[in-house]
A protein has these predicted regions:
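A cross-taxon signal for low-complexity, glycine/charged-rich
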Residues: 2-5, 17
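Accessible peptide chain termini
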Residues: 1-2, 27
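Catalytic cores of Mg2+-dependent Asp-rich isoprenoid enzymes
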Residues: 19-187, 192, 196-311
Length: 311
């Protein structure tokens, strides 16, 4: 349930294989598009499940439609060759297409597809608009003052994904708190995985600035071969914050009405817990800390069982 996900079993379903093939084909077509700047990434490149086989088959196309727009707009924000002004202008066009202010532009079809999906399902467009606002923030904001500042970013970049899925499956708003907590954890964990890359390629640091100052961590630490003592302290503080959020997130799968969504959520919770352990032990500056095939298999099987046999 966050901006960034991969299938738990390590295998793609036929639906996912078809979608990924179509998406990679679309990359070539979009390359000539003056608005999009595709990287070629798709749902198979993410850390956590994106519309996996666990979700109801009838709803997976709506998840794919939402993801495709998120991917396209995220790629714009992450394009180092574009100026901040250019990024904002492109993202603004996608947002205006979502809200109906730009009614007929073939280059904005991904926004129109989300509008059609929203009309068909009743899911609020705000969940897509919030993501675009997060990417606009990425275009102009490269540092975060404190944990609350970082959580404010996650409220736009991560929480809307979980809320979209809850609304799509007919869950009530009372589940938002647990979903927000889980999605925000996934976002922070992804930031910790990509600390060096985000700084070196985009000059972004998704760490609380006050924690860095207190620990004696400096920007240059992100260009070293391994994690410094000060930076390790900040990483561990972020993991402590994630652990607190997971206390809210872990009960979520047992609270959901839709059993298939509960299974997917239970899998994601276990993947998040596993990545928390790996990031405690590993050095994300020396090498990217990532989940392995056995992690996906183990978390997938345990999560599915937990979702099936809920109390």
């Amino acid at each position: 349930m966050a901006r960034h996900d991969r299938q738990c079993s390590g295998h793609k379903s036929p639906d996912d294989l078809t979608y990924n093939f179509r998406h990679r084909t679309d990359v070539k077509q979009a390359a000539a598009n003056s608005i999009e700047t595709p990287t070629g990434k798709d749902s198979g490149d993410e850390n956590f499940p994106v519309g996996s086989f666990l979700l109801p088959k009838a709803l997976r196309p709506h998840v794919a439609t939402y993801y495709v727009l998120a991917r396209a707009t995220d790629d714009i924000a992450d394009n180092g060759a574009l100026s901040s002004e250019d990024k904002l202008a492109r993202l603004d066009r996608f947002e205006k297409a979502l809200t109906g202010e730009i009614p007929d532009d073939p280059a904005l079809e991904k926004s129109y597809a989300v509008r059609r999906s929203a009309q068909a399902t009743g899911v609020p467009l705000q969940h897509a608009i919030d993501l675009i606002h997060a990417f606009k923030q990425d275009a102009v904001k490269q540092r975060y003052d404190n944990w609350d500042d970082l959580m404010g970013y996650c409220a736009l970049s991560a929480s809307p994904v979980g809320r979209f899925l809850l609304d799509l499956h007919g869950e009530d708003n009372a589940k938002f708190a647990g979903s927000d907590a889980l999605c925000n954890v996934l976002q922070v964990l992804n930031h910790l995985q990509d600390l060096a890359e985000d700084y070196q390629t985009l000059n972004r640091i998704y760490l609380p600035g006050d924690w860095m100052a207190a620990a004696g961590a400096v920007v240059d630490d992100l260009e070293r071969d391994s994690t410094t003592t000060g930076l390790r302290r900040v990483i561990d503080q972020c993991l402590d914050g994630c652990e607190e959020l997971m206390k809210q997130a872990r009960p979520l799968s047992r609270q959901l009405t839709n059993r298939r969504l509960a299974m997917e959520t239970a899998v994601i919770v276990r993947l998040a817990d596993r990545l928390l352990v790996l990031l405690r032990k590993g050095d994300p500056i020396a090498a990217r800390v990532a989940l392995g095939k056995l992690d996906f298999l183990s978390c997938g099987l345990r999560g599915i069982a937990a979702g099936l046999f809920r109390k």
